[in-house]
């Protein structure tokens, strides 16, 4: 039997996952993180993208987060996300359209253009699309 750690994934809308996992894989500010039982305590911010949970028995479940924070304690991992979606609920066509709209917004600069907001929308759309493609490639979803 594999060693497990308790994991919670929550957003402003509420808790989307709570349970025992063998590993949490997330995209932190400085790169990808693999968190398992006994990991050193840590707090880091998370970039938009997939969070993969390896549950008891090896089953994987993937979520998309738009950014947030990860807290690691000896027996607990908590993801506090701005928004969370189950990756299976993401629509690839919608993600493609959002990416194109964000790219177009960057090229159509006006006097009141907010480059930071446009860049954030582009990064989020690209992360959603990357999550959908990762699911399709690795998990046949």
Swiss-Prot record:
GO terms for cellular component: plasma membrane; proton-transporting ATP synthase complex. It is a peripheral membrane protein. Belongs to the ATPase epsilon chain family. This is ATP synthase epsilon chain. F-type ATPases have 2 components, CF(1) - the catalytic core - and CF(0) - the membrane proton channel. CF(1) has five subunits: alpha(3), beta(3), gamma(1), delta(1), epsilon(1). CF(0) has three main subunits: a, b and c. Its main location: membrane. The keyword DNA damage does not apply. Produces ATP from ADP in the presence of a proton gradient across the membrane. The gene is atpC.
């Amino acid at each position: 039997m594999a060693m497990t750690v308790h994991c919670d994934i929550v957003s402003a809308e509420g808790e989307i996952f709570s349970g025992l996992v063998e590993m949490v894989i997330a995209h932190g500010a400085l790169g990808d993180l693999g968190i398992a039982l006994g990991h050193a305590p840590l707090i880091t911010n998370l970039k938009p993208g997939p969070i993969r949970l390896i549950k008891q028995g090896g089953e994987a479940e993937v979520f998309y987060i738009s950014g947030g924070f990860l807290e690691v304690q000896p027996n607990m991992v908590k993801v506090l996300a701005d928004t969370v979606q189950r990756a299976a609920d993401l629509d690839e066509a919608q993600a493609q359209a959002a990416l194109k709209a964000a790219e177009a917004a960057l090229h159509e600069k006006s006097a009141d253009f907010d480059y930071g907001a446009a860049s954030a929308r582009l990064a989020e759309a690209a992360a959603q699309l990357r999550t959908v493609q990762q699911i399709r490639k690795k998990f046949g979803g």
